[in-house]
């Protein structure tokens, strides 16, 4: 009897750690799950400056620990090794190149008559360096060259092809896609409140052209890349813009960008009324729809964005929301959906 009583006591002492171990394992599993959910729902919008950002005139990219001064003409000529052509537009050619064991993008002016646009883009790059814009590594006005960080995933127009690859399957979710849409609106908001005043993204007369102005980074963020056409709007001085000198067509561009005098009156650039930054707002729903794609949950996101998108498509520019209004609405939807999913997950545990 004594031996049996002792055995029962011993069994209880041995089972207690097992029970506690099970509880600890469950608690640990919950912690891991919450961490995973927090990682999945990385709060969008990069409102605060990255503490790793360099002071004006300096850059850091890749695994660089310290900031380096923008490369000079001489350094660009002697230290940068051009590898292959990766892109070409009306203003410049872009070459994948190498500098100090870093992959970089070397842009070369292709036609002298486009030098004004080239220099405008360079001024925008130097003045708008931020988390919203591709990192500038150097330039040479004399040679017509600009060196920027290279992003192997390329243009934002490649998003679907990239996310369809098996290695990126885990990020092909409505959560990550909505975060991209928030970042896109963040860039538009930054341009509308930039250090250089209200800037309008004029190279955006159709969806493919608009997407080509942005790069997809390796950590699946968006940065503006092509800044050759960012004219200034100044409402105080009644300065408005016109994107190009040709007649525009289609429903992607804002109504005020269309020729207003009917088909019977031939288009004349000097008769075309100018417009303001609200043309960027009109295009947000179409760009956002592309970014959201057609994955599970994307239609749910579209439903929650319906009201703000309807406001963006107002025929009267003055009645459209500002970029900040749109950004606030996007972030509200993101956080609301995040809280709903996390609440449902907690209830399942």
Swiss-Prot record:
Top-level taxon: Eukaryota
SUPFAM superfamilies: Protein kinase-like (PK-like)
Protein name (record): Protein O-mannose kinase
UniProt KW keywords: ATP-binding, Endoplasmic reticulum, Glycoprotein, Kinase, Membrane, Nucleotide-binding, Signal-anchor, Transferase, Transmembrane, Transmembrane helix
Ranges of the Cytoplasmic topological domain: 1-19
Lumenal domain ranges by topology: 43-349
UniProt EC number: 2.7.1.183
Chain ranges of the Protein kinase domain: 80-349
Membrane topology: Single-pass type II membrane protein
Record organism: Rattus norvegicus
Signal peptide: none
UniProt family annotation: Belongs to the protein kinase superfamily. Ser/Thr protein kinase family. STKL subfamily.
Reactions accelerated catalytically: 3-O-[beta-D-GalNAc-(1->3)-beta-D-GlcNAc-(1->4)-alpha-D-Man]-L-Thr-[protein] + ATP = 3-O-[beta-D-GalNAc-(1->3)-beta-D-GlcNAc-(1->4)-(O-6-P-alpha-D-Man)]-Thr-[protein] + ADP + H(+)
């Amino acid at each position: 009897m004594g031996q049996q009583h002792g055995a029962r006591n011993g069994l209880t002492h041995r089972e207690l750690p097992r029970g506690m171990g099970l509880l600890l394992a469950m608690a640990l599993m919950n912690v891991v799950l919450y961490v995973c959910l927090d990682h999945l729902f990385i709060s969008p919008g990069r409102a605060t400056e990255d503490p790793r950002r360099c002071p004006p005139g300096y850059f850091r990219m890749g695994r660089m620990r310290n900031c380096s001064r923008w490369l000079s003409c001489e350094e660009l000529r002697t230290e940068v090794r051009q590898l292959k052509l990766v892109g070409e537009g009306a203003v410049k050619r872009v070459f994948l190149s190498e500098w100090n064991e870093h992959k970089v993008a070397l842009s070369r002016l292709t036609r002298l008559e486009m030098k004004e646009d080239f220099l405008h883009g360079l001024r925008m790059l130097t003045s708008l360096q931020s988390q919203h814009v591709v990192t500038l590594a150097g330039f040479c006005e004399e040679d017509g060259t600009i060196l920027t960080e290279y992003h192997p995933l390329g243009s934002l127009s490649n998003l679907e092809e990239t996310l369809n690859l098996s290695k990126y399957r885990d990020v092909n979710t409505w959560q990550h896609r909505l975060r991209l849409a928030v970042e896109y609106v963040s860039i538009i908001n930054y341009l509308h409140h930039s250090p250089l005043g209200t800037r309008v993204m004029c190279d955006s007369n159709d969806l493919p052209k608009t997407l080509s102005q942005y790069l997809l980074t390796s950590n699946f963020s968006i940065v503006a890349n092509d800044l050759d056409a960012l004219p200034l709007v100044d409402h105080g001085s009644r300065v408005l813009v016109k994107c190009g000198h040709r007649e525009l067509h289609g429903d992607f561009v804002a109504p005020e960008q269309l020729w207003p005098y009917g088909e019977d009156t031939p288009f004349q650039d000097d008769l075309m009324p100018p417009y303001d930054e609200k043309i960027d707002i009109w295009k947000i729903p179409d760009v956002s729809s592309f970014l959201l794609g057609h994955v599970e949950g994307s239609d749910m996101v579209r439903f929650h964005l319906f009201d703000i998108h309807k406001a963006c498509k107002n025929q009267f520019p003055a009645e459209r929301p500002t970029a900040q209004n749109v950004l606030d609405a996007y972030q509200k939807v993101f956080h609301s959906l995040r809280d709903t999913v996390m609440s449902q997950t907690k209830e399942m545990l």
